[in-house]
Regions:
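Residue-level detector of functional hotspots within protein domains
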Residues: 5, 54, 163-165, 172, ...
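Acidic-enriched, low-complexity/disordered segments with a strong bias for Aspartate over Glutamate
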Residues: 62, 73, 121, 128-130, ...
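Preferential activation on post-signal-peptide N-terminal prodomains/segments
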Residues: 1-147
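Generic alpha-helical propensity signal that fires on short helical segments
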Residues: 37, 72, 83-88, 179-181, ...
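Exposed beta-strand-loop-beta-strand "reactive/processing" segments of non-cytosolic proteins
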Residues: 73-107, 112-113, 143-183, 234-263
């Protein structure tokens, strides 16, 4: 047999083998997707049988977040304060846990846990009343924070805008900052920020979303919590630990008609959000 014919036969065999393997992969993916749909439907049915309506259009896809070990970097705190206040000096009352700065335009304090506050004199940082949301984001960017708006509240002559920090585009539910504006002037920032580095942590594989819903229901029963609807679910992190080193733990933030709950993405433990 000519070599060219042998070559063509070999190529045909390879094509057939690849097509067969591709068919197996597609079949497995179809089975997996069908299993996930059935599991999700079962979880939603279990919720309904317990009197809890699932108001989302569909069950969210399984979480892909991994736990992270985080180390807070405090070396940039003075620069962060000066980005808002201008020149500041560290105060003698500073300790290892709490560092104080003061300048002509206000004062700032930073804690090892990432908690901080900055008080500004009126007129130091101003914005058009119609641009406060954008101005707030710009202000937090000066502190090295990427953030999303959570809420806005008006109190007499003041308006308080609450932002949540994002870590690589993922919400950190336990890191929020309040910005208080008075007559177009930013007068106070306070909250918690992450500034440092994170490395993967060996926390185990995340639970499927269907399993999380079942664990959520079990957690409600164990804690004697009550709700009648699930109105939102979002994957993100919470910070564990209050020292310089801690962990970013993956969770599902579950919004209900009676409040929010965090469900650990690996263990399924449920914690009501204060």
């Amino acid at each position: 047999m000519e070599w060219s014919k042998i070559k063509n036969i070999v190529l045909l065999i390879l094509v057939c083998v690849n097509a067969f393997l591709l068919a197996l992969v597609l079949l497995q993916q179809h089975k997996t997707a069908r299993f996930q749909e059935e599991a999700s439907a079962g979880a939603v049915s279990a919720l309904a049988n317990s009197g809890i309506a699932f108001h989302l259009e569909r069950v969210p896809r399984d979480m892909e977040l991994a736990g992270l070990n985080f180390t807070q970097d405090r070396s940039g705190e003075q620069a962060a304060a000066e980005a808002l206040l201008g020149r500041v000096t560290e105060q003698a009352e500073s300790t290892t846990m709490r560092t104080l700065y003061a300048g002509a335009n206000g004062s700032a304090e930073f804690f090892m846990s990432g908690e901080f506050s900055v008080a500004l004199d009126a007129g130091v940082y101003q914005a058009d009343p119609d641009e406060l949301e954008r101005a707030g984001r710009d202000c937090l960017a000066l502190l090295g924070m990427e953030a999303e708006l959570v809420s806005r509240e008006t109190r007499e002559q003041e308006s308080v805008w609450t932002y949540r920090q994002l870590w690589e585009d993922v919400p950190v539910f336990s890191c929020q900052v309040e910005l208080t504006w008075r007559d177009g002037s930013l007068v106070l920032l306070r909250g918690r920020r992450l500034a440092g580095s994170a490395l993967p942590a060996d926390t185990g594989a995340p639970l499927t979303t269907a399993t999380v819903l079942v664990r959520f229901l079990a957690g409600l029963n164990e804690g004697n919590y009550v709700c009648s609807s699930i109105d939102g679910m979002r994957a993100g992190y919470v910070v564990s630990g209050a020292s310089r080193s801690g962990q970013l733990t993956p969770v599902w933030r579950v919004e209900t008609d009676t409040g929010a709950y965090d469900v650990d993405g690996v263990t399924g433990a449920l914690v009501p959000v204060a």
